[in-house]
């Protein structure tokens, strides 16, 4: 009877029922099924009282749980499973929410949905208040970022102790592909610069300007984990995080090195496409420059074969080297080394021809001395030339007169005439000049 009566009252716990039955068995030896009508009435009153208490105070389990609902308690939210970011090493709420974020924003000010948050991302105060960003947030990568020095807009200034500002810092876009990581990290670095964290970014030599603080490292880790999901990270980034999941600085340093390498590759391609050579520089220097560019490109995965390299080199030749375009352009198996052999041959020929030419250039002081000596030596010549010319003219007249008289004279014969042509004619003048027939 008692078991039938208990089955009619499901709200009475099984433990209490067993306890009552056990107590009856311990104190008395009465059959538990043999119960009087008065006892049944007592059970009815007890069950009615229990039903009234359960009606006024409903159990917490009566409300169904929503697995996607963010509980106000941070500990009740399941942490995200993000691969390289181990949840056993996650930071506490006090570590993730320092008080010194007034200068460059706070991880809690970043837009994300509640079910993506782990306990370390919960901001202080009501969890239902999330900042609303203007329409410019989430724009493409090509859109310019706000000016440096801006901070996030604080939508909960009444409950937060952070300094509220009117301007905001646009966060980087979400990484959606490993191939987009080089472009994404540029926007992430710009985001850090706009957040007054440009001093912690590694420079060209791989070292930051100043030492990063613990709060800044927390901010760096939080923002990188939120906007760069682990499934979209490149392999080399995952390798770094597998060693130290908080070493975001090493990732930034490697990214900057890759940016510089990409810039060098672009410069090398432009330089190789715009080569110019006319022999004004040594052929050895020109060959070293070209071969270094080709080697760097090949090492970085940009392969330049001999055919393409020779075409680019020959296109930039000018002057005496220009004819190499037409003598070698049909050789399909020509190498860069063979082309430079021809360039060296022309350059050496040019240098040899220049060295063989006489050098007429003289010092300026020697030219002045020569001009002075020339003026001094020409003056006596000018003075001595006029009387000589006069005497010569007189001797010619006297000679002509003597010749005419000798011809007209009967005592002269042809032998004397022929003899006079071979012997000098003696003239009686004060200069005693000796003239030959070919002089007049």
From Swiss-Prot:
The keyword RNA-binding applies. Capsid protein (CA) is the structural component of the virus-like particle (VLP), forming the shell that encapsulates the retrotransposons dimeric RNA genome. The particles are assembled from trimer-clustered units and there are holes in the capsid shells that allow for the diffusion of macromolecules. CA also has nucleocapsid-like chaperone activity, promoting primer tRNA(i)-Met annealing to the multipartite primer-binding site (PBS), dimerization of Ty1 RNA and initiation of reverse transcription. Pfam families: TYA. This is Transposon Ty1-DR3 Gag polyprotein. Residues 299-401 are annotated as: RNA-binding. GO terms for molecular function: RNA binding. Retrotransposons are mobile genetic entities that are able to replicate via an RNA intermediate and a reverse transcription step. In contrast to retroviruses, retrotransposons are non-infectious, lack an envelope and remain intracellular. Ty1 retrotransposons belong to the copia elements (pseudoviridae). The record marks 401-402 as: Cleavage. Residues 1-10, 48-60, 127-152, 402-428 have a biased composition (Polar residues). It comes from Saccharomyces cerevisiae (strain ATCC 204508 / S288c) (Baker's yeast). One of its GO terms (biological process) is viral translational frameshifting. One of its GO terms (cellular component) is cytoplasm.
């Amino acid at each position: 009877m008692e078991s039938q009566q208990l089955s009619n009252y499901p709200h009475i716990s099984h433990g209490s029922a067993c306890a009552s039955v056990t107590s009856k068995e311990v104190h008395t030896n009465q059959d538990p099924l043999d119960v009087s009508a008065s006892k049944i009435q007592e059970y009815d009153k007890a069950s009615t009282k229990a039903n009234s208490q359960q009606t006024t105070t409903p159990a917490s389990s009566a409300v169904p749980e929503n697995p996607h609902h963010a509980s106000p308690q941070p500990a009740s939210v399941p942490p995200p499973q993000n691969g390289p970011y181990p949840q056993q090493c996650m930071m506490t709420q006090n570590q993730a929410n320092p008080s010194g974020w007034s200068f460059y924003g706070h991880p809690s000010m970043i837009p994300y949905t509640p079910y993506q948050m782990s306990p370390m991302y919960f901001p202080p105060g009501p969890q239902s208040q999330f900042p609303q960003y203007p329409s410019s947030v989430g724009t493409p990568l090509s859109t310019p970022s706000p000016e440096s020095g801006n901070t996030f807009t604080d939508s909960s200034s009444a409950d937060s102790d952070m300094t509220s500002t009117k301007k905001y810092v646009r966060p980087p876009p979400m990484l959606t592909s490993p191939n987009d990581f080089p472009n994404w990290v540029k926007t992430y670095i710009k985001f850090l610069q706009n957040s007054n964290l440009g001093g912690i970014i590694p420079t060209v030599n791989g070292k930051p300007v100043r030492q990063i603080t613990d709060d800044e490292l927390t901010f760096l880790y939080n923002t990188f984990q939120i906007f760069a999901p682990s499934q979209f990270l490149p392999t080399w980034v995952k390798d770094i995080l597998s060693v130290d999941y908080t070493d975001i600085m090493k990732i930034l340093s490697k990214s900057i090195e890759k940016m510089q390498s990409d810039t060098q590759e672009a410069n090398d391609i432009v330089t190789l496409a715009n080569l110019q050579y006319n022999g004004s520089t040594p052929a050895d220097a020109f060959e070293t420059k070209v071969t270094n560019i080709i080697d760097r490109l090949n090492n970085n995965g940009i392969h330049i074969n001999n055919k393409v390299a020779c075409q680019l080199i020959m296109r930039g030749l000018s002057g005496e080297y220009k004819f190499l375009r037409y003598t070698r352009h049909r050789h399909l198996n020509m190498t860069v080394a063979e082309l430079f052999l021809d360039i060296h041959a022309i350059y050496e020929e040019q240098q040899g021809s220049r060295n063989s030419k006489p050098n007429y250039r003289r010092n300026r002081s020697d030219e002045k001395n020569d001009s002075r000596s020339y003026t001094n030596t020409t003056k006596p010549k000018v003075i001595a030339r006029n009387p000589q010319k006069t005497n010569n003219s007189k001797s010619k007249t006297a000679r002509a007169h003597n010749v005419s008289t000798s011809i007209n004279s009967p005592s002269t014969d042809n032998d004397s005439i022929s003899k006079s042509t071979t012997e000098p004619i003696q003239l009686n003048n004060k200069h005693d000049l000796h003239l030959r027939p070919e002089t007049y």
